[in-house]
């Protein structure tokens, strides 16, 4: 997989000459445009001579008025404007020659301060020099009283120190002159007098001038002094000195400051940059069209705030030149220099200043840095996400008559979206001579335009998108179908994937334009192809609500119905009998098996007749002829199960019906199983067709069933009052125990809650029995079929609401005894409001949290793409069932973890027979065989052990869950992994929302915060578990005042070595005396600190721990996520190493680099016979990992923009554009999917789809 564009983007410091070479002229005046003529002022910030003409090929003075492209490249002799296109005003830069050097604020203030590190100053000292508070010694000359780079602070509190420094130096000069009458002696004596008395001010300039005269010492202040010092740095020499110092102090001392300095020195040397370039002598002026002035209605103007910042610089620069010419006192000049420095700082990064420059509305002006960073910055707003043409949005409504690959687009919207294509069609078919005529036809609503529209919409699908787009199914393609009205019509089955409902949701429509885009939309994104959800490989298009209800009603059986016992010889005969009202839909009838499709039955079965209903005949007609006949709720073995409904013709049908037990109708669960089996057997295309038939049948019969719900359907439940009386008595008893001091407050609360929970459970059980007796009760039908609601809702309607949560989310002791049917009392209503409100507040907060989690996950994993077939990895990953060791229950069974993965080696049973050969994809069948053989641990190929330098291979990834086939090369599995973990994150959060705050339903505090804790690699203080550092046996547990000391003994070469672990107060122990422990084993309850685990037990232990813990959180919420997605994120978290010894490589001790970069350096060192570096594994949270990415563009667009860019500039980093984000920013095709493998195959698939649809 080669990167097709082979370009790199490099960022580095610009020298003054470089900036001048970019420039097209110097800006010397602060004016922008003339208020009368509204034309650009000469030499100002919008000058046409510098930046190019405002109108194409027209000059400023009016000599060249007519825009004539023939004049391109000429210059107007009168006004000097080059005649060219006005677009150059977006790219031509100017410059300002600064009267005095200024430092770049990033180099001074972004921590760690780069200039301070280079000059070995404290950043505070550096700032004092730059902002004209303190002087600095540039060269001590022959004076022994000063050191180079010493800062002379004149702040009131610190001037004492400076006075005592200057005193001896001046005394020395008096001795040197040795002439009491000399002018300088008199001057020196006056100075000494001022220095000795702290209340008298003294002139430091005078003092330093005198010292310089006699000792050749040099002093400086401001950026020019810093520039002077930076020029003095000899990189090679400094690198050598720093390395020697590092060697001298040894590896264990605190050497972080030296290492930082060495890093900067080496970076500058490697990237051929001079330190003094960090100080600006020339300031670039960005092109005027990027900082425009815009005229508003009413003749007023508004301008980009950057212009204000530039004006301020130019004004101060001019003033400084004037002051210098006039020969003003140094204090005035220094003040002007300081103001220029601050003006430049404000332009570059206003928010970093202690007192930012403010606009009229008292908020800081937006500087160049703030234009880059944040959600509204250039990176995220304009480079990673753009607004697109040919798009529209509207409210969605249900489209029950659509096919699964269609969407209804309102006619007016379609006309606007497809306007260019309509115009083209009208011209081609000679209804319009030119574009103008065609546009006029559209304006006048000519009937021909609708014919044109009908034709052109067949050429291209549209993309529908619903925000928030949490996973790849949030954007799908559909063939447009014109509909009346203004709402977009959406197929009811795709709503789950979009997480849409029809209560006012809006969706956006986009039209793909190019041939390739159209082909991709058709071949890869069509709604009818998205049958499976990528996160778990389960069908995502499961029917809901009305469709379930209709199918339930159609497959319902009842004895004693009209036409029961009628025998039919043909399917059509039975259906006609139903249509004419001879037989009811749910009556049990007989039909000759021979009349039904032959493939559905065995030879033997076809000799008898089948007991069924007309509804079931209609239901089975939606399936393919080779799909088994479904007559009951056993789907997996439908072919055998149907035997119990087939009778020999010798048996009388009425007799058979009398002995026959009614079977339950088809419910939601069965429909899901049918879809799964159907998909595996027939693929996406046929499944979509079947689903459309299922939908039509469902809607038809849910309408015919006339199911409604009213207060009359909800039976009153009188028994509850007896239970209440009994419970009240128990509670009174508990309270009296508490009053007598036999129970603590906590115990009392616990027991009361238990009593009321039991009551509610009991009422719920009894209600279930009551409900089941009336199988036609609409509430029962809805709950039983899975269409809507459940028994808990029903309990609340007629039984009791039960216990509620309080504002903190704890359970209250007072239950709500009323049901909704009776109505709640005022106090009960009040108690129930807490939970419901908390649910709403949680939802709002956690949705944002979850969205941010997804964003960070995408950033950490975006560069992972499937790049080849097999990496030939020499290591596998051993897995077993995920077991919650605390409660000893299975969270993820082994089968779920191995299906769809490749085996690493032969998997054999006890006898040595091979069940699955090496490198074979394990299907469901093989997985069952492995489990049947009693195997509990399996070594599989995993992303975690994949050997590819970049990306992963097909074998290590395994099956693509969204297509149920092997993953294709080019699949961006990193992003899919991030979406699959992030998308249910919102469900983790929304769970509290649906229960209306009913107690007992766990509020998800362990959910999202726990995931964040694991992936950010943080642990909450106080909840950290103690882990064993070495293997051994727990030889003793000593308890002293609630604090345990666990003693672990290990045997090393025959000697017993003890290690003691002190626990927190009242910590819960996880081990007993005599237990064997392995490194990393938990000794106390709590969450493990991942850094410690990595240190003690190595990477595999960390990988397994994160996998298990993340799975635990999701599975407890009933959400299934495939292991491989979590593995990808974990792979990225463990992808970095920290250099411990740099050997003879250019890597520095303490530097964090990616494993692939480290491997490259080691290989290179070995090849050249140098000592290779040594490093240890690092685990980085998903917040930190992207910032350490190989690509600086990707890191800068994630977070900490200024810091990432400053670092990249000093290192002169190159971005090889290997990830997805970098290429999106530059408008390239991403190196994934068709951008990697080419589009030919996709074009062919799309062509075939198109033929079949129209």
From Swiss-Prot:
Residues that coordinate or bind Zn(2+) 2: 871, 946, 953, 956
Pfam family, one: RNA_pol_Rpb1_4
Reaction catalysis annotation: RNA(n) + a ribonucleoside 5'-triphosphate = RNA(n+1) + diphosphate
Gene3D superfamilies associated with the record: 1.10.132.30, 1.10.150.390, 1.10.1790.20, 1.10.40.90, 2.40.40.20, 2.40.50.100, RNA polymerase II, clamp domain, RNA polymerase Rpb1, domain 3
Residues the record lists as binding Mg(2+): 501, 503, 505
Known cofactor(s): Mg(2+); Zn(2+)
EC number(s) from the headed UniProt entry: 2.7.7.6
Gene Ontology cellular-component terms listed: DNA-directed RNA polymerase complex
Residues where Zn(2+) 1 binds: 59, 61, 76, 79
Quaternary context: The RNAP catalytic core consists of 2 alpha, 1 beta, 1 beta' and 1 omega subunit. When a sigma factor is associated with the core the holoenzyme is formed, which can initiate transcription.
Matching PANTHER family: DNA-DIRECTED RNA POLYMERASE, DNA-DIRECTED RNA POLYMERASE SUBUNIT BETA
Similarity field: Belongs to the RNA polymerase beta' chain family.
Protein name in the entry: DNA-directed RNA polymerase subunit beta'
